[in-house]
């Protein structure tokens, strides 16, 4: 099950019957037609649970029993498309929801009453997300929440509504409509809270934290690996120089404080600078050990 489906199923289980939610669903997924010389309304979805939810909203809010039809997508036997259809009291329902325009169509923008009322806005956003919303799987590490609108003015009104809740919302126009979207993880989590998806928010946050933790571990591991490689390369260079000194003038030619450093390094190629310092009879700092190793390398290079 996709992350989007998980969120939608969670908010479908919330016990609510709000006209503003239904308004968003009709505006974004509905179309008008004529049936037996009467105005008809068809609301289309690919999710059976959303279709049943729309049916329940219409039944509870307007005491009507619409019809649910379905058909298969062309060549995709497993993908059903559901239509919630009604041809009774359509004009009255649209008028009550303030959706009808003067040309017997559906208004494309968002009513000012919804834009100015937080509770109405939350319900509208819930309906909008159920209709055409999607969230990119947070496991991908690229965060995005999108809501598609057929009309640009609706997408822009939707952005204004989301911005009221302090969300950094953007709109992009496409050939067949416009998308209102969020790209910041914190904004997406806030949006999930707004529409009532607390479990979705927690799941999103957990995935985000786990990804960040894994990335931190990987960065630390990469840094440690690089440091180990650097230490080994430096160790090999110094050991080669110690062998050069041994074969030409002998280690006994070195000052006594360098001889012991050379012996430890040659005997323990894998030792860190701190481990070499800890192996000395006379305590020495890491910088002191480094200084002596540089001296040994310089002596070998001058031979």
UniProtKB/Swiss-Prot annotation:
Q: Which InterPro entries match?
A: Homing_endonucl, Sporu_reg_WhiA_N_dom, Sporulation_regulator_WhiA, Sporulation_regulator_WhiA_C, WhiA_LAGLIDADG_dom
Q: Which Pfam family name is an example for this entry?
A: WhiA_N
Q: Which GO terms describe its biological process?
A: cell division; regulation of sporulation
Positions of the DNA-binding region: 272-303
Q: Name one GO molecular function term.
A: DNA binding
Which keywords label this protein? Cell cycle, Cell division, DNA-binding
Has keyword Cell cycle? Answer: yes
Chain's role: Involved in cell division and chromosome segregation.
Task: Give the similarity note.
Answer: Belongs to the WhiA family.
Q: What is this protein called?
A: Probable cell division protein WhiA
């Amino acid at each position: 099950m996709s992350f989007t489906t998980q969120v939608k199923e969670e908010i479908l289980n919330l016990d609510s019957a709000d006209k503003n939610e239904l308004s968003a669903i009709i505006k974004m997924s509905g179309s008008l037609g004529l049936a037996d010389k009467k105005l008809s309304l068809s609301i289309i979805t690919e999710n059976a649970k959303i279709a049943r939810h729309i049916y329940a909203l219409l039944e509870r809010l307007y005491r009507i029993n619409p019809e649910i039809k379905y058909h298969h997508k062309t060549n995709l036997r497993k993908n059903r498309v559901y239509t919630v259809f009604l041809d009774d009291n359509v004009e009255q329902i649209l008028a009550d929801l303030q959706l009808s325009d003067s040309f017997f169509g559906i208004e494309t923008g968002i009513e000012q009453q919804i834009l100015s009322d937080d509770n109405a806005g939350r319900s509208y956003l819930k309906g909008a997300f159920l209709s055409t919303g999607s969230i990119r799987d947070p496991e991908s590490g690229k965060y995005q929440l999108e809501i598609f609108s057929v009309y640009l003015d609706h997408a822009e009104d939707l952005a204004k509504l989301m911005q009221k809740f302090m969300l950094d919302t953007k709109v992009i126009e496409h050939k067949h409509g416009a998308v209102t979207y969020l790209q910041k993880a914190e904004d997406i989590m806030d949006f999930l809270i707004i529409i009532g998806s607390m479990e979705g928010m927690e799941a999103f946050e957990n995935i985000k934290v786990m990804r960040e933790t894994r990335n931190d571990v990987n960065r630390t591991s990469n840094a440690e690996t690089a440091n180990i490689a650097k230490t080994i390369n430096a160790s090999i260079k110094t050991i080669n120089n110690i062998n050069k000194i041994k074969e030409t003038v002998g280690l006994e030619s070195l000052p006594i404080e360098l001889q012991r450093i050379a012996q430890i390094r040659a005997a323990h190629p894998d030792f860190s600078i701190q481990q070499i310092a800890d192996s000395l009879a006379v305590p020495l700092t890491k910088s002191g050990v480094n200084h002596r190793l540089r001296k040994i390398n310089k002596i070998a290079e001058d031979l």
